UniProtKB/Swiss-Prot annotation:
GO terms for biological process: proteolysis. GO terms for molecular function: aminopeptidase activity; metal ion binding; metalloexopeptidase activity; phosphoric triester hydrolase activity; proline dipeptidase activity. Mn(2+) 1 binds at D257, H339, E384, E423. This is Xaa-Pro dipeptidase. Signal peptide: none annotated. Splits dipeptides with a prolyl residue in the C-terminal position. Its cofactor is Mn(2+).
Length: 443
């Protein structure tokens, strides 16, 4: 923990420097960052599960406590008003005493509404960062100082460059997720249902289903052709052919996002396709380096998908280059190669080209690509190619001019398996790429 404490000190210094810069640029005195508020269900007396403001947990690893406030000016010790009411109806988090609290001025906030009296009176040049805009207005913040876009753009852009503390947290999240993936694979091997496989994952990771950074995707057979399948059938299918799991974990607010696909019959054609996609994914990662645009690797992955379509006799009589040019690979790989990862699963600034918020959109041919950045050291991204058999995407190709090149009998034979996705989390360094997932031997 001493090591994490020293890394956090450096992390805090980096955030303070960024804060000084953004305040000076926009003639502000401070930022007031709100953890968030509970949101009440309509016509009910219960609340939705609390999800913290990512800009708040960038500063402090407080992820489950609403009504907290952080005052930062880039110079003085950050001040945290920590919500700690007297309450016998609900459990209350005690005032934190951890590796990070020596660097933060932590003050208890007994009542959520008391923050108005706690804040400095002069706050005309203070920006509110959070989603409770009505609360900010009640505190006297002007509209232009509630989530000002230029400030958010600056903060989002530099969140792409992870500090050593953030990388350490993300490696810990990887460890937890890998434990869960191994438990889920064992559950799949024993013939469990999607629902029970998910329970095995949660048990192994120590997460509740509201704690994971995104809804776990646990898909058997053709369900894995639904990219964000989250139904979780309670009964296993009569025949189990394949298993796709896309599930992550969190550590101090930082996410892991991993996907693996398995065939029940290791000697099947589908198993061979999984193996070859795995080979192509690793080969692509071996080519990734700082200074190159992420979009280029997405296009290269489509070239590799074309190779697989040819070698597995799924598309014939047309060159790999023509497959990519004509978009034949797109119904098989309809999503992007991956996305930035960090405090959020789909982390901010994937399209942002500078700290002023200049965006470069995804190419029109690949509209679901989530990152167009030039890769730089300290960026963390997912690499998650897929190869799916999705009826709705393949249907137009059955009647088009290129239909004759599709081996429909073979495609239809693989449709009951759903699809494949293989996802690793990588860190860009100066002279190498760190594969956090494979470093933990998750095959």
């Amino acid at each position: 923990m001493e090591t994490l404490a020293s890394l956090y000190n450096e992390h805090l210094s980096t955030l303070q420097q960024r804060t000084r810069d953004v305040l000076e640029r926009h003639q502000l005195d401070a930022l007031l960052i709100h953890s968030g508020e509970l949101q009440r269900l309509f016509l009910d007396d219960r609340d939705y599960p609390f999800k913290v403001n990512p800009q708040f947990k960038a500063w402090v690893p407080v992820t489950e406590v609403p009504n907290c406030w952080l005052w930062v000016d880039g110079v003085n010790t950050p001040k945290l008003w920590f919500y700690s009411p007297v309450d016998y109806w609900h459990s209350v988090e005690p005032l934190p005493d951890s590796f990070w609290t020596k660097n933060i001025d932590v003050q208890p906030l007994l009542n959520a509404d008391d923050i108005a009296q706690q804040l400095p009176v002069q706050r005309e040049r203070v920006a509110y960062i959070g989603y409770a805009q009505q609360r900010a207005q009640a505190l006297g913040f002007s509209a232009e100082n509630i989530n000002p876009q230029p400030v958010l753009d600056y903060l989002h852009y530099y969140r792409s460059y992870k500090t050593d503390y953030e990388l350490a947290c993300m490696r810990e999240a990887q460890k937890t997720a890998v434990v869960g993936h191994r438990a889920a694979y064992e559950a799949f091997q024993s013939g469990m249902s999607e629902f029970d496989i998910n329970l095995a994952y949660l048990m192994a990771t120590g997460h509740r289903d509201t704690d994971v950074p995104y809804d776990n995707i646990v898909a058997l057979n053709e369900h894995s052709a639904v990219l964000h399948y989250t139904i979780l059938q309670h009964q296993p299918p009569a025949e189990i052919r394949s298993f796709l799991i896309d599930a992550g974990a969190e550590y101090n607010g930082y996410a892991a996002d991993l996907t693996r696909t398995y065939a029940a019959d290791r000697d099947s054609d589908f198993a061979a396709l999984i193996s070859d996609l795995n080979t192509e994914q690793l080969a692509l990662i071996d080519t990734i380096k700082s200074g190159e645009r992420y979009t280029d690797y997405h296009v290269q992955m489509h070239q590799r998908i074309a190779k697989l379509l040819r070698t597995h006799n799924l598309v014939t009589g047309i060159s790999e280059e023509a497959m990519v040019e004509q978009g034949i690979t797109c119904p098989f790989l309809p999503h992007g190669l991956g996305h930035p990862l960090g405090l959020q699963v789909h982390d901010t600034a994937g399209f942002m080209q500078d700290d002023k918020g200049t965006n470069l959109n995804a190419p029109s041919k690949y509209p679901y690509l989530r990152c167009t950045r030039v890769l730089q050291p300290r960026m963390v991204l997912t690499i998650e190619p897929g190869l799916y058999f999705i009826d709705s995407l393949l249907a137009p190709w059955r009647i088009g001019e290129f239909s004759k090149h599709f081996n429909w009998d073979r495609i239809d034979a693989l449709k009951p398996y759903g699809g494949i996705r293989i996802e690793d989390n990588i860190v860009i360094h100066d002279k190498r790429v760190e594969n956090m997932t494979r470093d933990l031997k998750l095959a």
